């Protein structure tokens, strides 16, 4: 009987140790990193508040391999990989879309800036394709240089007529080969690209507004009755 109890005790302890092993891991927990929109100064000139148009930012497209929550990196010999233990809070195109909307709204040069889910109509549509959003190790240094490139098309809502295209980019070298430094370089490169996007989008729409001035608003009806 004592022998059976001893065997049962050993079995319980073994099962407990096995179960404990199932719920413990030596792997570091995955870290989520985010980027902030740049503080864009309000440019001089531009469109007057009354003439300021509205803009909708369509859901961005991305080159193959980039639309993911992974922080992507490029290595020699045309290899693409990603950092383990790190992720963006959303797929990259969703994050870029939010940053574009925040940047354009903060400029104060638009009557309204809406994302792709807005139910309200807009005067212009901005379509962005992300060509690069990666940490580039192909130059041979110990730390990467982050590259961001955005291909932009602006069109009128009416008739879907394209009125301008441009490419903006930004690059920033990471101070060291450490995730915190690499994420900081991602933010610097993205800030440069978004700041340029804001300026060029405004220039394209301002030029279109000058070529096609809108009809002035109709005068408001007077509430006064004619004198008898």
Question: What is the predicted function of each stretch?
Answer:
Residues 51-53, 67-69, 76, 84, ...:
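Envelope-exposed proteins and targeting segments
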Residues 80-87, 158-199:
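Short secondary-structure boundary motifs at beta->alpha junctions and helix caps
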Residues 93, 97-101, 107, 187-194, ...:
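Extracytoplasmic/secreted envelope proteins and their assembly/folding machinery
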Residues 1-9:
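Bacterial N-terminal signal peptides that target proteins for export
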Residues 20-42, 107-158:
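Surface-exposed short loop/turn segments
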Residues 20-93, 204-228:
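A structural "domain/chain start" motif
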Residues 15-18:
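C-terminal motif of bacterial Sec signal peptides marking the signal peptidase cleavage site
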């Amino acid at each position: 009987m004592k022998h059976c109890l001893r065997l049962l005790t050993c079995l319980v302890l073994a099962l407990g140790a096995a179960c404990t092993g199932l719920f413990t891991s030596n792997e570091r927990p995955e870290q989520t990193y985010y980027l902030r929109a740049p503080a864009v100064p309000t440019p001089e000139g531009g469109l007057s508040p009354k003439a300021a148009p509205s803009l909708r930012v369509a859901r961005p497209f991305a080159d193959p391999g980039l639309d993911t929550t992974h922080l992507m990196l490029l290595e020699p010999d045309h290899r693409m990989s990603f950092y383990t233990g790190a992720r963006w809070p959303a797929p990259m195109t969703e994050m870029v879309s939010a940053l574009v909307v925040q940047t354009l709204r903060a400029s104060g040069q638009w009557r309204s800036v809406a994302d792709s889910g807005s139910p309200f109509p807009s005067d212009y549509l901005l379509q962005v394709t992300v060509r690069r959003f990666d940490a580039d190790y192909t130059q041979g240094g110990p730390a990467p240089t982050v590259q961001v490139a955005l291909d932009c098309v602006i069109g009128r809502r009416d008739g879907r007529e394209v009125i301008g295209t441009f490419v903006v980019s930004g690059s920033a070298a990471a101070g060291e080969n450490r995730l915190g430094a690499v994420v900081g370089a991602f933010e610097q490169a993205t800030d440069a690209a978004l700041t340029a996007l804001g300026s060029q989008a405004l220039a394209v729409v301002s030029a279109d507004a000058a070529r096609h001035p809108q009809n002035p608003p109709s005068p408001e009806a007077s509430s006064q009755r004619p004198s008898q």
